[in-house]
UniProtKB/Swiss-Prot annotation, chain B:
<comment type="subunit">
    <text>NDH is composed of at least 16 different subunits, 5 of which are encoded in the nucleus.</text>
</comment>
<comment type="similarity">
    <text>Belongs to the complex I 49 kDa subunit family.</text>
</comment>
<protein>
    <recommendedName>
        <fullName>NAD(P)H-quinone oxidoreductase subunit H, chloroplastic</fullName>
        <ecNumber>7.1.1.-</ecNumber>
    </recommendedName>
</protein>
<comment type="function">
    <text>NDH shuttles electrons from NAD(P)H:plastoquinone, via FMN and iron-sulfur (Fe-S) centers, to quinones in the photosynthetic chain and possibly in a chloroplast respiratory chain. The immediate electron acceptor for the enzyme in this species is believed to be plastoquinone. Couples the redox reaction to proton translocation, and thus conserves the redox energy in a proton gradient.</text>
</comment>
<keyword id="KW-0813">Transport</keyword>
<dbReference type="GO" id="GO:0016655">
    <property type="term" value="F:oxidoreductase activity, acting on NAD(P)H, quinone or similar compound as acceptor"/>
</dbReference>
<keyword id="KW-0934">Plastid</keyword>
<dbReference type="Pfam" id="PF00346">
    <property type="entry name" value="Complex1_49kDa"/>
</dbReference>
<dbReference type="GO" id="GO:0019684">
    <property type="term" value="P:photosynthesis, light reaction"/>
</dbReference>
<keyword id="KW-1278">Translocase</keyword>
<dbReference type="InterPro" id="IPR029014">
    <property type="entry name" value="NiFe-Hase_large"/>
</dbReference>
<keyword id="KW-0520">NAD</keyword>
<keyword id="KW-0874">Quinone</keyword>
<keyword id="KW-0150">Chloroplast</keyword>
<keyword id="KW-0618">Plastoquinone</keyword>
<dbReference type="GO" id="GO:0051287">
    <property type="term" value="F:NAD binding"/>
</dbReference>
<dbReference type="InterPro" id="IPR001135">
    <property type="entry name" value="NADH_Q_OxRdtase_suD"/>
</dbReference>
Length: 190, 393
């Protein structure tokens, strides 16, 4: 069984209302689903005999600020039994809560923490939803498109206070943007 | 005289971010009942550098120097996956000679990574000697890399469509010499370590992962293969030119730390086999022969053909990523290293998600140490083989 048959089989088997978009391409097949049906779809994919997608490879968050439901959460899955991969995607906005799949795939624990930390998408029923990669006491969700690359605060060790302090960022050099796509020579005065 | 009372409550001990061994900055908060471990909580994020956000603002060629800093011991794999992603997006074929050079570099990098896993693993257990031996071999690898790529560790060697430069004169002979030198060295390690009773006491039966558990927790790489599942992306995905070589997937059934050690040692030997076959079968042969044939009096079209090329140093800096999503993966020495790439019809990717094997493999640590003694934590942590550079990105 390869990618296409597992995709085709699952399409024919589960209720149509579970996916509202499917796409197949040579780069991988994907299902787009609603947050309500996400857990059911993953449960089906994991336990059904002819799909047996037992390995959760990756949970990825993507930010499309131009859309109404700006975040998209992508679950990359792998079936070692049938050697095929499939992607399940759902969209969410800042306040939607997605049901956690930790009970299905234990490896989702840290991935969901990372999506929460980086994007701000929270998960219901997650045993331990807190920040994982950012600093203690960090405010904001870094991978959103409206968060600047340099961040808002910088840290330094303050000798009088004998600890590390966070201060608003101080740029000693003006930000220079180099347009790599344009063939014209870039000059700093624009 | 009052007799001091013995307290029975649990101790919470912090194994702070700084470690004497080379795992990197990982903080473990361990709850102990005497010598038994009740719970262990890893805290990450000390090496988080925002690699994914930086990727959204760099072209691929600008981003290549960053990627070697994820897994800084197996650098060729991070570069390989960074160029594999746009290559698959744009359906770019890689010449066969470049593919062979890539495979040779990747397997040398795998040997280097497993060597530098072995040293700190033995040092954590208490044996200091192998640490020096592995660095002796690693220095030879650094020399090979330096002559081929210019840098000892952070090579920046791979390009979209091939490699940056062809192998220098005499490199193939040097590499074959290294392979001949290395195999008896691995035998020396095995004589020193594998049947050593102290080592076996520390390592056998420690950190057992059952087959079902390994699949559920999403493990990959040697951790999965040591639990009885012969899953190797090089065989399963048929990428680069691994199919042209004769090699086996190394796996064990026991699932404890000893099995992981055995898998990695045999992977090193298998890598040497692959390298020897690749060096003998490289299209065009050593660079001096290829050069001579190209400049031959009767100009033979074959030696200038696509298959005998590497790619030169300057692909277009404005390589546009089309608006597609794809997930590429490679069998890194630690596990399955993957990139989920969403292009945006521009030179910058819209989303560059790194799937590090270390993050997933580390997640199982709290469960593994639950019934173990304090000293076993380091053994298990060492056998998982993590690099915080890729866990935290």
């Amino acid at each position: 069984m390869d990618n296409q048959s597992i995709f085709q089989y699952s399409l024919e088997t589960f209720p149509k209302k579970w996916v509202h978009l499917m796409e197949r391409s040579e780069h991988g097949n994907r299902f787009d689903t609603n947050t309500d049906y996400l857990f059911k779809l993953l449960y089906f994919l994991k336990f059904h005999t002819y799909t047996r997608v037992q390995v959760l490879i990756d949970i990825c968050g993507v930010d499309y600020p131009s859309r109404k439901r700006r975040f998209e959460v992508v679950y990359n899955l792998l079936s070692t039994r049938y050697n095929s991969r499939i992607r399940v995607q759902t969209s969410a906005d800042e306040v939607t809560r997605i049901s956690s799949v930790v009970s299905l795939f234990p490896s989702a624990g840290w991935w969901e923490r990372e999506v929460w930390d980086m994007f701000g998408v929270s998960f219901i029923n997650h045993p331990d939803l807190r920040r994982i990669l950012t600093d203690y006491g960090f405010e904001g969700h870094p991978l959103r498109k409206d968060f600047p690359l340099s961040g808002y605060v910088e840290v330094r060790y303050d000798d009088p206070e004998k600890r590390v302090v966070s201060e608003p960022i101080e740029m000693t050099q003006e930000f220079r943007y180099f347009d790599s796509a344009s063939p014209w020579e870039q000059r700093s005065d624009g | 005289m009052t007799v001091p009372a013995t307290r029975n409550d649990l101790m919470i001990v912090n194994m702070g971010p700084h470690h004497p061994s080379m795992h990197g900055v990982l903080r473990l908060i361990v709850t102990l009942d005497g010598e038994d471990v009740i719970d262990c909580e890893p805290i990450l994020g000390y090496l988080h550098r925002g690699m994914e956000k930086i990727a959204e603002n760099r072209t691929i060629i600008q981003y290549l120097p960053y990627v070697t800093r994820w897994d800084y011991l197996a650098t060729m794999f991070t570069e390989a996956i960074t160029v594999n992603a746009p290559e698959e997006l744009g359906n770019i074929q890689v010449p066969r000679r470049a593919s062979y050079i890539r495979v040779i570099m990747l397997e040398l990098s795998r040997i280097a990574s497993h060597l530098l896993w072995l040293g700190p693993f033995m040092a954590d257990i208490g044996a200091q000697t192998p640490f020096f031996y592995i660095f002796r071999e690693r220095e030879l690898l650094y020399d090979l890399f330096e002559t081929a790529t210019g840098m000892r560790m952070m090579h920046n060697f791979f390009r979209i469509g091939g490699v940056a430069a062809d192998l220098p004169h005499g490199w193939i002979d040097k590499c074959l010499d290294f392979c001949d030198y290395f195999l008896p060295e691995v035998a020396e390690y095995q004589k020193l370590i594998t049947r050593n009773p102290i080592f076996l006491e520390r390592v056998e039966g420690v950190g057992f992962i059952a087959e079902e558990e390994a699949i559920n927790w999403g493990l990959s790489g040697p951790m999965l293969r040591a639990s009885g599942i012969p899953w190797d992306l090089r065989k399963v995905d048929h990428y680069e030119c691994y199919d042209e070589f004769d090699w086996e997937v190394q796996w064990q059934k026991e699932g404890d730390s000893l099995a992981r050690y055995l898998v990695r040692i045999s992977e090193m030997i298998e890598s040497v086999k692959i390298i020897q076959q690749a060096l003998e079968g490289i299209p065009g042969g050593p660079y001096e022969n290829l050069e001579a044939r190209r400049f031959d009096r009767v100009r033979n079209i074959e030696w200038n053909d696509f298959e005998y090329r590497f790619i030169s140093k300057k692909p277009s800096p404005t390589f546009e990523l089309s608006k597609q999503e794809l997930y590429v993966r490679v069998e890194a020495p630690k596990g399955e290293l993957g990139i989920f790439l969403i292009g945006d019809n521009s030179v910058f990717p819209w989303r560059w998600k790194i799937r590090p094997p270390g993050l997933i493999n580390l997640q199982i640590l709290p469960q593994l140490v639950k019934r173990m003694k304090l000293a076993d934590i380091m053994t298990i942590l060492g056998s998982i083989d993590i690099i915080m550079g890729e866990v935290d990105r």
